[in-house]
């Protein structure tokens, strides 16, 4: 089953025919809210609002472990994480979709592993490619089917938040190779890897990062909300195309290729 994690601007899923909501108790505390189960265009999905259904949980206080564990415990095998980002790359202006393929983690102090380190041998999980390639290709196929012009690949810089960045910080991220900046990409992606969820991100650029675009323009909540209002219907179309895919069978994936979904 497909799990959808909604970020800023997606605290509910338009068009979802809800069957039930369920509060999941986890060994890691409470998730951001109950899981919402239903059908999207006739296909089963589970939806979770990352920041809570009232958008009350800031990125550095999200219980990422509980969120990811809750989805997996209910039979979710594949996860698309929807997140807003600031565009650093010149092609990632407001309103542009992106399917990143790399992450640089600048966060700190977040619970970032399910491991207990209770005397058992330490396991070092490979994270060379932080996103599930199969799920990335599904996202790419869905964006093509929705006739979206999108950015394929790119480096997601995961920062602590909740404040936005300074121009100097964005300049540093750009020198490090980042194409976009967001606050929720880690440890979410790694936790999904630890428990074998096939996870990828569809990022939505809602503003130019500080100093990009019109560098004199301040980043305001109104600016971000206006962009979100313009992309919600487009995002819903992408998610419908994702929901209609078969998640009971693992797809053969060729690096750099589009699988038949």
Predicted segments — roles?
Residues 130-174:
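Active-site rim beta-loop-alpha module in soluble metabolic enzymes
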Residues 68, 170, 186-189:
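Generic hydrophobic/aromatic pocket-lining and core-packing "Φ" positions
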């Amino acid at each position: 089953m497909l799990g959808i994690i909604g970020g800023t601007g997606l605290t509910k899923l338009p068009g979802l025919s809800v069957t039930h909501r369920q509060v999941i108790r986890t060994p890691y505390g409470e998730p951001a809210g109950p899981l919402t189960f239903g059908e999207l265009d006739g296909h089963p999905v589970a939806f979770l609002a990352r920041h809570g259904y009232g958008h009350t949980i800031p990125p550095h206080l999200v219980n990422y472990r509980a969120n990811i564990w809750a989805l997996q415990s209910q039979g979710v095998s594949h996860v698309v994480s929807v997140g807003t980002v600031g565009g650093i790359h010149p092609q990632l202006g407001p309103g542009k979709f992106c399917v990143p393929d790399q992450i640089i983690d600048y966060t700190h102090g977040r619970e970032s592993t399910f491991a207990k380190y209770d005397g058992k041998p330490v396991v070092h999980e490979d994270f060379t490619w932080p996103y599930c390639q199969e799920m990335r290709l599904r996202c790419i196929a869905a964006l093509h089917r929705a006739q979206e012009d999108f950015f394929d690949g790119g480096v997601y810089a995961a920062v602590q938040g909740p404040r936005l960045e300074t121009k100097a910080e964005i300049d540093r991220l750009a020198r490090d190779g980042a194409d976009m900046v967001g606050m929720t990409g880690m440890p979410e992606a790694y936790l999904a890897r630890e428990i074998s969820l096939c996870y990828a991100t569809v990022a939505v650029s809602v503003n130019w990062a500080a100093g990009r675009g019109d560098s004199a323009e301040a980043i305001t909540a109104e600016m971000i909300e206006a962009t979100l209002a313009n992309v919600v219907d487009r995002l819903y179309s992408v998610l419908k195309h994702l929901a209609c895919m078969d998640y009971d069978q693992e797809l053969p994936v060729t690096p750099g290729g589009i699988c038949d979904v």
